[in-house]
């Protein structure tokens, strides 16, 4: 969590590369049962955050023995909000699960309740540049996080020899050029808030644009699937980055050795889609290519079992545990 003003909230949505949502807490209280929850919520001044004609939805996360069903928490919250407006003689607000005017989050830990407004809308991993995808594409925020862990700063060429739909390539380009990840999005939820300041958001975007920088190197992607290559090229063009990203149709073992040290980051096909013997052979091939073609370069390889690294056969400097969706890697 962090504390800041309205400008920082806008900037967090527009510029953060590894956040999924930016929530603004608006009320905290205690409740030991659903009736107390209803009473506490109904007591709030909902007109400070929405009009009766606005649509809304609740997202709930519950860690409590007193509240065993998160959906029921959402129902009681909905009743409290609707009753607040109806009893004031206003229109009955409508629930809309898809892209509501206001999305509220309720988090309950034991008897501590936090009500927050979602300022983002769609998850921030949905940058806006992905117009096509391959099977099980990597999340944009995961890709950005891995690149930040790898200390990618655009000071060398970048290589992903198993690029799939191009997520790592594009996120690497955004970082290298200092492009804000939110610059591709059509909108954010805070733009529909009652206190939205369009001029302030324009200032945030102008300040982000002032941080753009030249990238003097190149980003190379390849994949042995022609369909993946087509998807990656399409996404690269949509992002307007085809001047610094080249995507080729070739397998990793056919990739030429770079002329100078590079940063290589790749997410090989994982276990659910390959036979055990195929996985072992794949990672052994990766190790051989790294040894012969990428001496002096830095490589970050995503793997899903410790033995995958054993198959690579090279000494590792660091291993970092993370989640790719529901898969530990």
Regions found by a protein language model. Give the residues of each.
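Non-catalytic nucleic-acid substrate-recognition regions in nucleic-acid-modifying enzymes
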Residues: 1-102
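C-terminal catalytic and target-recognition region of SAM-dependent MTase-like enzymes
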Residues: 250-329
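S-adenosyl-L-methionine
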Residues: 1-20, 60, 64-72, 108-157, ...
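Short, surface-exposed charged micro-motifs
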Residues: 103-107
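Hydrophobic beta-strand segments of well-ordered beta-sheets in folded domains
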Residues: 54-57, 219, 298-299
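Nucleotide donor/acceptor-binding cores
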Residues: 53-56, 156, 262
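Conserved S-adenosyl-L-methionine
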Residues: 138-257, 272, 280-282
């Amino acid at each position: 969590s962090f504390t800041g003003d309205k400008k920082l909230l806008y900037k967090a949505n527009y510029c953060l590369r590894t956040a999924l949502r930016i929530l603004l807490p608006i009320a905290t209280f205690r409740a030991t049962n659903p009736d107390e929850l209803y009473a506490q919520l109904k007591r709030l001044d909902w007109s400070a955050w929405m009009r009766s004609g606005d649509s809304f939805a609740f997202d709930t996360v519950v860690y409590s023995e007193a509240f065993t069903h998160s959906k029921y928490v959402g129902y009681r919250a909905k009743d409290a909000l609707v009753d607040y407006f109806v009893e004031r003689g206003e229109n009955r607000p409508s629930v809309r699960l898809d892209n509501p005017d206001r999305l509220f989050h309720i988090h309950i830990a034991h008897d501590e309740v936090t009500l927050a407004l979602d300022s983002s809308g769609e998850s921030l991993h949905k940058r806006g540049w992905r117009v096509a995808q391959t099977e099980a594409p990597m999340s944009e925020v995961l890709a950005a996080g891995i690149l930040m862990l790898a200390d990618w700063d655009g000071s060398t060429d970048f290589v992903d020899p198993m690029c799939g739909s191009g997520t790592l390539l594009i996120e690497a380009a955004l970082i290298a050029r200092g492009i804000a990840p939110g610059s591709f999005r059509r909108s954010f939820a805070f733009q529909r808030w009652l206190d939205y300041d369009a001029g302030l958001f324009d200032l945030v975007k102008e300040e982000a644009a002032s941080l753009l920088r030249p990238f003097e190197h190149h980003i190379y992607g390849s994949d042995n699937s022609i369909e993946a290559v087509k998807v990656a090229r399409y996404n690269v063009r949509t992002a307007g980055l085809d001047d610094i990203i080249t995507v080729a149709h070739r397998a990793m073992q056919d990739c030429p050795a770079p002329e100078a040290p590079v940063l290589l980051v790749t997410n090989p096909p994982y276990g659910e889609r390959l036979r055990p013997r195929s996985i072992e052979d794949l990672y052994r091939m990766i190790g051989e290519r790294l040894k012969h073609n990428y001496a002096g370069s830095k490589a970050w390889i995503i793997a899903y079992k410790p033995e995958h690294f054993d198959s690579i056969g090279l000494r590792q400097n660091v291993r970092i545990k993370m989640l790719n969706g529901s898969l530990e890697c």
